[in-house]
């Protein structure tokens, strides 16, 4: 009986700590830039990390929480086009892992089906926690929770390592310190 109480107490501490961390994360914006895919500039992107995080390599590897805000620049973009855009983002980061991409296809399609059409200045927020995955919020309403370490890393990499100019702009505040 005592052992059961201890296990319940430990579970409660772990669960409450993750909820507390999510609500009370003090985000610091470290950079912003415009995402491009070919000749298309679909959105501006802002990168924020918790206060005190300064290691660029560890941020890129997904070892720290990250908040990514997208401000859409396109006047109007259909649900299908938004899905194609994110599909290419995933596919580009699975280049060397074609089989892994095929295995993840079902989860990727579920995510893509949740994405709505967009209009200029629509605001999306992706919040990533290493242990919990990535959540998508549109107008402060949770739309989807993307699970799977490889999928989350692929999406993070599509933003953080896609283009050297965008990468340097996203990490500009940290680069100025070093």
Where are these regions (language model features)?
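Terminal leader/tail segments of proteins
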Residues: 21-178
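N-terminal signal peptide c-region/cleavage motif recognized by signal peptidases
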Residues: 16-17
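Sec-dependent signal peptide recognition
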Residues: 5-10
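Short, Lys/Arg-enriched N-terminal segments with co-localized hydrophobic residues
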Residues: 1-3
């Amino acid at each position: 009986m005592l052992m059961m109480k201890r296990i319940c107490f430990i579970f409660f501490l772990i669960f409450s700590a993750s909820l507390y961390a999510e609500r009370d994360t003090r985000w610091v914006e470290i950079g912003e830039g415009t995402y491009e895919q070919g000749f298309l500039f679909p959105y501006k992107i802002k990168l924020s990390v918790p206060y005190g995080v300064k290691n660029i390599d560890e941020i890129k590897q997904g070892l720290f929480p990250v908040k990514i805000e997208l401000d859409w620049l396109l006047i109007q973009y259909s649900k299908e086009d938004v899905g194609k855009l994110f599909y290419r983002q995933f596919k580009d980061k699975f280049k060397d892992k074609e089989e892994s991409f095929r295995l993840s296809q079902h989860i990727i399609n579920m995510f893509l089906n949740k994405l709505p059409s967009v209009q200029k200045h629509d605001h999306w927020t992706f919040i990533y926690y290493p242990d919990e995955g990535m959540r998508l919020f549109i107008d402060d309403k949770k739309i989807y929770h993307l699970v799977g370490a490889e999928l989350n890393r692929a999406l993070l990499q599509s933003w953080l390592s896609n283009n050297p100019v965008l990468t340097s702009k996203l990490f500009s505040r940290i680069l100025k310190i070093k």
